């Protein structure tokens, strides 16, 4: 059999695979998609893609949930406060956020599609590093001209409150961890014990070390990879390291388009390219990745979906 024939047969099998592609983390409610949402969601339905609209402020959280309720077969949502918005006004928003979350959980219709809390965490990306300090991170009181340093305690307070709310309502966390792996793990370790079986949430847009990945796994978190893995080869070893059963794919759209869409606005449909890359790196078929990641999503995030819908299907391995 020629290579062309073999590839053609594989593509037919892949097209027959019933498991939806799951984009675990997108921002389809952002204004970047104004005017395009309907056409993008139509393409998602055509290509069997579902996504979670991740909240970053109270406003985008509510908008993401509204979108999920309008397109309930395609979209879900989280409510969350992103650390980059955790300044003095963020403390006021935190109180309003807590009230909104409580009302959402109590509303029978909303709670079926509000599936987690986040994105929340710590973000040190815009902070100058200090090599003289053991952890390399500047803190409040350090002698540096950087306005964001003073917001670290607020970031931490907003993050910890969302962890507490996740525990109170038994919801998974969508963790934002940018240049802050050790600090984020330190905070999470105050609330979760290493080696516990219970699922706690997902470390989104993971680009840390294997040791940091293992630390998240040990605390009960999964790890998601973006389109970065399609054009930065150094992360292939990390993808090989993380078990498929503890992994997700995400677009973080409208940001960070994968190959071959670099330079264009990202959409949840492009998660297909991330799935293909994971299959290539793992050395398994695309259908195996689709099955495993969908079942991961149903177990941990999309609990209203029937995980057994496709049990009669046997994927090509």
Features from the language model and the residues they span:
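Mid-domain alpha/beta scaffold segments of enzyme catalytic cores
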Residues: 1-317
